[in-house]
Curated annotation (Swiss-Prot):
SUPFAM superfamilies: Ribosomal L11/L12e N-terminal domain (SSF54747), Ribosomal protein L11, C-terminal domain (SSF46906). It comes from Chlorobium chlorochromatii (strain CaD3). Part of the ribosomal stalk of the 50S ribosomal subunit. Interacts with L10 and the large rRNA to form the base of the stalk. L10 forms an elongated spine to which L12 dimers bind in a sequential fashion forming a multimeric L10(L12)X complex. NCBIfam families: L11_bact (TIGR01632). The keyword rRNA-binding applies. This is Large ribosomal subunit protein uL11. GO terms for cellular component: cytosolic large ribosomal subunit. Forms part of the ribosomal stalk which helps the ribosome interact with GTP-bound translation factors. One of its GO terms (biological process) is translation. Keywords: Methylation, Ribonucleoprotein, Ribosomal protein, RNA-binding, rRNA-binding.
Length: 141
């Protein structure tokens, strides 16, 4: 018989940087999950991407065991990394903070494709271009 799922927890945690402090500890503690065990497993799985924000979906079962799935980093994080910027523009239509090439957008779209709700690569690229536009990053073709 399969274990009964009692909840899902969605978090965005720096790769290799999970620790029992907020937001990880309180979110897992509410469901009764072994916080240190999760931190060890997550840090071991993501240590190669250290520092990058990684979304994670944790499935908690009735016996307090858990499984987790890591996703690709959010598109804004990848765009800022490609544009060598710390943050996006506060006024994206007026102030542009950086530029990325069409090739860099394609690379990000290929990386994000499993997590995006896009039919093909062209649709994924359009989503990434829209994200860049809303952050004040210019896409050069």
């Amino acid at each position: 018989m399969a274990k009964k799922v009692i909840g899902f927890i969605k978090l965005q945690i720096p790769a290799g940087g999970a620790n029992p402090a907020p937001p990880v500890g309180p979110a897992l503690g509410q469901k009764g999950v072994n916080i240190m065990e999760f931190c060890k497993q997550f840090n071991a799985k993501t240590q190669a991407d250290a520092g990058t924000i990684i979304p994670v979906v944790i499935t908690v079962y009735s016996d307090k065991s858990f499984t987790f799935i890591t996703k690709t980093p959010p598109a804004p994080v990848l765009l800022l990394k490609e544009a060598n910027q710390k943050k996006g523009s506060g006024e994206p239509n007026r102030n542009k903070v950086g530029t990325v090439t069409g090739e860099q957008v394609r690379k990000i779209a290929e990386l994000k494709m499993p997590d995006l709700n896009a039919v093909d690569l062209a649709g994924a690229e359009a989503m990434i271009r829209g994200t860049a536009r809303s952050m004040g990053i210019v896409v050069q073709d």
